[in-house]
Amino acid sequence: MEQTYEYAWIIPFIPLPVPMLIGAGLILFPTATKSFRRMWAFQSVLLLSIVMIFSIYLSIQQINSSSVYQYVWSWIINNDFSLDFGYLIDPLTSIMSILITTVGIMVLIYSDNYMAHDQGYLRFFAYMSFFSTSMLGLVTSSNLIQIYIFWELVGLCSYLLIGFWFTRPVAANACQKAFVTNRVGDFGLLLGILGFYWITGSFEFRDLFEIFNNLIYNNEVNFLFVTLCAVLLFAGAVSKSAQFPLHVWLPDAMEGPTPISALIHAATMVAAGIFLVARLLPLFRVIPYIMYLISVIGIITVLLGATLALAQKDIKRGLAYSTMSQLGYMMLALGMGSYRSALFHLITHAYSKALLFLGSGSIIHSMETIVGYSPAKSQNMGLMGGLRKHVPITKITFLLGTLSLCGIPPLACFWSKDEILNDSWLYSPIFAIIAWATAGLTAFYMFRIYLLTFEGHLNVHFQNYGGKHKTPFYSISLWGKNGVKKNSCLLTMNNNESTYFLSKTKYPIDKNGRKMTRPFMTIAHFEHKAVSSYPYESDNTMLFPIFVLGLFTLFVGAIGIPFNQEGVNLDILSKWLAPSINLLHPKSNNSQDWNEFLKDAVVSVSIAYFGIFIASFLYKPVYSSLKNLEFINSFVKKGPKRILWDKIINGIYDWSYNRAYIDAFYTRFFVGGIRGLAEFTHFFDRRVIDGMTNGVGVISFIVGEGIKYIGGGRISSYLFLYLAYVSVFLLVYYLLFSTF
């Protein structure tokens, strides 16, 4: 076992050859590299599978032995300072490694089909493999300096992937927004790291925790400065995990390809913030104010994310706000000290959310055959509906993910969310009420997404896409979206070979799509069904990862069932996390009996079903005449009270749809303020600073020109002027001082 741990340092570097070889191949042998491009997808999956097997083996060793392994290489710069590099293998590392690799493999397989017609295919897989390398390096780091290095690499990869189609202005703006927002948190993280190094003299986690605990115990530190440094460290997690108030980048990150959304929201970027807080929890737990701040930020994010998801029309943005809310649950659990519950929910949510995002990608893929390449249309739930008849497998798996996030047993998120809800009562009744109410909101908005997408009738009618001439679909060039020439087809990239990784079937894209010339948000009447094309189910290459993630969603919750009945211990997760739990809570007991579990579960499931019922009542087409996704039913008679109620509902709807006006506030006060300051600085620099400098030169030039014309070149003239000046000076002197 010791030898296995000794080779664990290689984990982050196994996927690294793929982006390096792709880059070298495109420079040295571009034609051959592009011709055999699907070979790189196979290598990406193969190398990440090796990491997954290695990570699973390490996890089994840890479950059996409850061991933690750390290895450090020291680079001594001078006698007073040495920089250490190493790797740490503990339960948190193994959990994150398995999450990254399992979800990453599914996303890579899925992407082989999803990105098959994109000329940036090779660039996409290079970025994805480098993303996996960065995240694996982050979770295996043994000190804060290494974490910061890989932390920045994760941010870089997310910037590249969110802006993958950067020729689209919205995608370019989205990646810049994500980058700048995360720079705020990253700057705080760097300052916090340097602050704690100044306090403890170490970057290594074990030394840092031990030294800091001794300093706190002996009251040898400035508590205010320590709190400030801890807040700065936490700021990095707030930005990376899209917690309030640095959450604004997350919905815009949906401008990247859908597989990227699945990876970012499930196991990489947003999970990095939760990982950082979990890793530093032994540091935070001795600072009570920080733990309370973490829980407050978590509960605000829980409620805010859920309310902002209520009115979203874009299916990916709705799921993005769902991610924000669920990350808030994890942050709340960490702030309450519920280390096990937070990591359990991280695991279950990762598989459920990856399933939902890949399912949404399958839906978008099928809608593009009708509306063409237009994210504003293909991702709009107002143009969907009735897809259960056309994409039945996607519908079943999407329903599994939806019910899991709703908290319906026996699906994965039921077990983890229930633990967080129960722990919240022990921490704060106010927090508990908000958390339980938000669980009902979660069920409401998730089932709203499901009903708008799959129930009713297909809301796209080609008569709404006016125009006598058919127009081709868009192809996506190497550097983004680019219109193809007329009468060209999207599937002409390579007609001589199969385009899919697991299947040789080709599906031609229907050419019946038309450009839309009228507002597409007005949903046509359901009785008008004259459509000339319908969506179809995705290829097996996309369905296989969705099916596997569906199995994870069904069964992964079993690892954390907290029952210990009659000597039968089903709680694998507690045994897995034993070293970390014992470090944080030496006398903790996570087991429950059946009676206690059933009492809590009945309440949470009832709340979830109530949210589902309200969503079904409002959004199921049979019972509702909703149009444009509003919350108004026409069967209620109008009256003064009803009109007031409608105004309130519309106000809430506008508040939710417009992201609580937080983005507008930031744009007006922060972005506008910075632009105003920049304009003033530019004016001051050009008119004042440059004016002074240029003014000296102009004055010198004028004086020189004047002197040039006064001097004639004769000595007699110079003597005459000299004597005249002296005479005038003497005359003035005599007149001024003659009285004295």
From Swiss-Prot:
Catalytic activity entry: a plastoquinone + NADH + (n+1) H(+)(in) = a plastoquinol + NAD(+) + n H(+)(out); a plastoquinone + NADPH + (n+1) H(+)(in) = a plastoquinol + NADP(+) + n H(+)(out)
Residue ranges the record marks as coiled coil: none
Protein name: NAD(P)H-quinone oxidoreductase subunit 5, chloroplastic
Gene this chain is encoded by: ndhF
A GO biological-process term: ATP synthesis coupled electron transport
Oligomer status and interactors: NDH is composed of at least 16 different subunits, 5 of which are encoded in the nucleus.
The UniProt record lists the keyword Kinase: no
Origin superkingdom: Eukaryota
Single GO molecular function: NADH dehydrogenase (ubiquinone) activity
Transmembrane regions: 9-29, 40-60, 89-109, 125-145, 147-167, 185-205, 219-239, 258-278, 286-306, 327-347, 354-374, 396-416, 425-445, 543-563, 602-622, 717-737
Subcellular location: Plastid, Chloroplast thylakoid membrane
Family note: Belongs to the complex I subunit 5 family.
InterPro entries in alphabetical order: NADH_UbQ_OxRdtase_chlpt_su5_C, NADHpl_OxRdtase_5_subgr, ND/Mrp_TM, NU5C-like, Proton_antipo_N
Keyword Ribosomal protein: no
Swiss-Prot/TrEMBL keywords: Chloroplast, Membrane, NAD, NADP, Plastid, Plastoquinone, Quinone, Thylakoid, Translocase, Transmembrane, Transmembrane helix, Transport
Gene3D superfamilies, sorted: 1.20.5.2700
Listed EC numbers: 7.1.1.-
Topology within the bilayer: Multi-pass membrane protein
